[in-house]
Amino acid sequence: MMNRSYDDFMKEYDPKVQPLMDSLRKFCFSLGSNVVEDIRMHRVVFCKSFAFRWFVYVEPQNDSVLLKIQKSRRETQTVELALDEDLDKTQELIREAYNTIH
């Protein structure tokens, strides 16, 4: 199967979740030049390239976005973000996860 692009992936979801997905994606890429995006069937996974260790899964829902954030090798945290929710706390969690991966 061909690797789908992010845009192709997003066509399958309600357009109203696109701005939130775009913001989260932009934030993940802003963390470092080594961030790699892996488009899966129902989610977008962000990894650190050299280890290909994921730090966050981002999965669009109907009117929210579900995130699974890697806190440590054994611990993940699930966050459901409403479309109008403030991103600051979630971005901090994602940044911590990114910085924790070695």
Q: Residues of each region from the PLM?
A:
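Charge-dense, helix-prone N-terminal extensions
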Residues: 1-102
